[in-house]
């Protein structure tokens, strides 16, 4: 798959840069002179698979020092017949305006249920940012939309997320869940 190959090459290039940096630090400070500890990790969790489509959340964590590292989620959905990565317009037929309205409604319910966890303007941010390029991935229960830490709330609140049932959308693709078509 072209996308995964490009990502793998980026990761290799990044890690080679880390090795080069560490070698420079060892040369400059000696093996005992480096006190900086950092690490990164990547985990991919399959959230949906039906033989035709696969969707997963790639969860990354990068710690470079300080109080905590930074997590990152990357939602990825592929058509296994074509090998192509799918975007929201490949999955749903709704307009961008309809998408924004549906997702904002679900986030409004979530935010209003826990208002103390969110920035005062969290719902405005959702309304302003939901579009065809929004972060998403497929699950058995629907399309999951999410924001990264600090986007709508504090780091401690994690990733604000909602899963919206497929029947809320005009689906372009036919998904299978066990024996039943979604």
Regions found by a protein language model. Give the residues of each.
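Compositionally biased intrinsically disordered regions enriched in Thr/Gly
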Residues: 1-182
